[in-house]
Amino acid sequence: MRVLADMTGNVTPTEGDGGDVRSVAVVGAGVTGLVAAYELRRRGVNVTLYEASGHAGGAIRTTHADGFLAEHGPNSFVTSAAVDTLLQQLDLQDDVVEANPEANKRYVVRSSVMTPFPLTPGAMLGTSLLSFKAKLRVLLEPLVRTRTQDTDESVASFVRRRLGHEVLDYAVDPFISGIFAGDPETLSMAHAFPRVAELERQYGSLSKGLMMQRKRFSSGETNPATHEGHLTSSPAARARLISFVDGMQTLTDALEASIAGTLRLGCPVRLVHRQEGRWVVDAGQDGAARSRTVDAVVMATPAHVLAAMEMPAPMRKFAAPIERVEYPPVSTLTLGFRREDVAHRLDGFGVLVPAAERRNILGALFSSSLFPSRAPDDCVTITCFVGGSRQAERAREDTDLLVERVLLDLRQLLGVRGEPVFAKHVYWPRAIPQYTVGYQAVKDAADTTEQQNPGLYLAGNYRNGVSVGDCVASGQQVAERVASYLTRAG
């Protein structure tokens, strides 16, 4: 990896609050905050990036041990025009690894049997994952009436209405677990999967909408392959599922290196308030807190961190709905096995487990099948996910009990025989924001908070999508909005 602090042509501003250089505080050094700070610094803005913990990157962190690679959080992400631009600016193209095209199977468990998820209409007709009755229900989807009520609808209600309960249980439910670790009965269709909801509104049918999208894509009009459609980008090259040779932390390490001198680790922000048209940020540990006056503030923290921060009463009133965003706990358990101790070929992306199967795991990634350098040559790596909205108590279990429960599933589903030769357990007490029914109140609160507090900006995965690509785009977009504000403010 070749990263220099100013390799992208950054203007490196001098320290201090005075002079002609505009100053911005970015709070939270996850992907969104890092990208926002990077983009602002490229524009010549004097940036200070505050991070309460001892490391940057948020949920992205990579452990290397005994020839194994374990991701603490995201294992991969989908590229877009915005992502490709960032990778080029950071000179990371040579570090990128694309997912193995031969590992494109997604297995789903039904009746304790792993079945490839059908990815084409022909495969759907032939799959054993759905009954004949369920397949017929899917084929009749264009005849289902369009919903006329304008109220928010849960994912479960939407899918049952258009495709039937079996598709919900064995096609949609497991993917909800894979993306949100959530419950389709409580997640909002309009906010968790806005593009899919829009297909019904625009075309009256999901089937018709998908056919129209494919037709438009083949003519070069749009790119429908981006993640869930939370943040669209301009048409670009083929979307790719990628990681990096040395793991996902390569991205956040490169961003951190590119903004050298701006990052304050172990420096929690305690108070943000407006004073004489500017913003005062109080940050630091007990006894070492310092104030800094800046022209604008980007809050790139999770919603629950925002809730714990001191702020003036009027600001808290506007932000109140944001503080109620739910974050269920999730544990990731990366296990390494000798190849001969796993009967299954691991010839795919991984396996997802519907809630109806009543298993211990939400799903598992076949990490060493997906990307190289994830395990020694004679071993394999499997990354398992436990907990989420419907099994929160499982995520909180200690490592020994968690390994025991997970091994029970892996032995039955994958034919695992021996004990793991590597294990890495990471517990996330608040993992992924849940875009629940009524989530428009959260988005409205964020908009109102910004409107009532000029120079204050809210960003992060509770606003515009939970994927790494969404967070990259969110950081880029908030930096653009801040830069426009600074220009208008003179």
Which sequence ranges carry the predicted segments?
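Conserved flavin/dinucleotide-binding core of flavoenzymes
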Residues: R2-P13, D17, P118-G122, L346-G348, ...
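Dinucleotide-binding Rossmann-like beta1-alpha1 core, especially the glycine-rich loop
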Residues: D66-R147
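Mid-domain catalytic core of redox enzymes
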Residues: R2, G19-D20, R43, L265-I382, ...
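Conserved Rossmann-like nucleotide-cofactor binding loop
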Residues: T32, H55, H304
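Active-site/ligand-binding neighborhood in enzyme catalytic cores
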Residues: V138-L271, T293
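Feature captures the FAD/FMN-dependent oxidoreductase FAD-binding
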Residues: T85-T115, L163-D169, S258-L265, R270-W279
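N-terminal Rossmann-like FAD-binding beta1-loop-alpha1 element of flavoenzymes
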Residues: R22-L49
